[in-house]
Every structure is written in structure tokens, then in C-alpha cells.
């Protein structure tokens, strides 16, 4: 099996996840974004037949007598004491996010659409996002994205300026030196 990891950081909790349909063998997602869990949590879906090497050995609750991790998932990756409060918080957040996913997606799409339309009317503003996206990226000509983000923050509008952990995308867009302003309603 050829390993194929999909990063669902901006997708999980907002759109249905279909890793088998997508042909991926692993799907990683943070808990604190669309899944509404606590910071420091996350999930890794691993397809049947894929075995990952553990980062640490020993201290597993399922084979305490062994110095090595069991060769079964998920036990193979779970050494030490699990973050049970974090897991419970992630579970509660996931339940809420998934129960309201359609409603949230419709509201987010409407907000993004209104903002995109308004930004496209402004002189000197370049919008990088497709019309059907659930987040929005833009720049104001001649003003660094971080400066725009700070100015909006002063008005009580929370956005993020910069490269958003995606230098390849910014290289493609020609914004590697300035980044972009990202709005995630």
C-alpha cells in the first residue's frame, strides 16, 4: 500500500470526509478547528492494513508487561497515559459540529459569498478564493496582509494575515512575499 496522507485541517467538521473514496491511506485533522475540540487534540484516520512505526515504546495499557508497543492499531501509537479530558472534549465538539454541519456550511457559504461580493467591488482588492469556498483569502494592493489583518482586528474583525502554513500555495499565487488575509467565518 502506497502511503497517501491527506491534511484535513480546513475540512474536518465543515465538509463530509470520505478518505476511502479519495484513495488516501491516512487522514489527519486537528481537533481545535472545525471539530470544535480543545487545543492539543486531533485525530488520525488510518486505513486497514497500514501499520505506522510508533514514535515511543512502552507504557501501553493494553500490554503493560511489554517494553514495546503492540503491533495492533491504535495501541501501536498510544504509549503513556491518554489525554482523556482532551478526548472527551474532542468527542463532544465533534458531535456538535457534525450535528450542525449542514446548517453551519450554509451559513458560512452565505457569509463568504456576501464578503466576496463586497470585496470584489472594492478598488485595489484582489480576491483569491473561488465563489463556492467556505473561507476567503484576499489582499489589498500596496498593504502587507499582516497590516490589513491588524487594522481589521482593531475594528473587532478577527482574520489572519500571512502564509497560513501554505508556502506552496502562496508561491503559486505570487504572494509568497506578502501572504494574504484569510477570513474563516
Regions found by a protein language model. Give the residues of each.
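Glycine-enriched alpha-helix->loop->beta-strand junction motifs that scaffold or abut catalytic
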Residues: 22-26, 153-156, 177-179
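Buried hydrophobic positions in well-ordered alpha/beta secondary-structure cores of metabolic enzymes
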Residues: 4-7, 27, 44, 90, ...
